[in-house]
Amino acid sequence: MGKNFSLNTNKARPKNDFYQTPYSMTRHLLDREKFEGKIFEPCCGEGAILKVLDEYNYEYSCGDITFASNFLENFSQHDNIITNPPYSLAKEFILHAKEHTSKKIAMLLPLNYLHGIQRYREVWLDTEFPLKKIYVFCRYPMLSNEIREDGKYGSGMMVYAWFIWDRDHKGSATIDWIDNSDDIIKK
């Protein structure tokens, strides 16, 4: 994102692209998608996604690069993965997850991740572990390294979506929208 479009123009990018996932964003995902089996969160940071998985009574395990558990060096098999990966490594995370996941993958990514010929060839054309659904947030969430207990967040300038891959999915991916207006902090 260019400096003219970012609200973070004078700050360095957080180490390891650390942006927490507001609780409400994960709740929106889990209200729409069901996961069978255990969930692995490879970028757990301070546990924001894990807190919501706990609320929804999912069994999970986690890892994070900050405590020596680099997902790209992890070759364990998982039933499902839910994560907000470092966007600078998104393609690598997606490809690695597809090799080590048996059921579903959900990743929170900027919507503009959809474009690009290399991603098209390496990620989107895959029919063995295809993209099933994209849940686009109607309002632009502002992700930061701090989150509020109530799950609310400011409005930013980047469009985010939950991208869902499902090994058993047949056919084209579909798009749905998440009305997150109630999650935006009113000024």
Where are these regions (language model features)?
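Class I S-adenosyl-L-methionine-dependent methyltransferase catalytic core
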Residues: 1-187
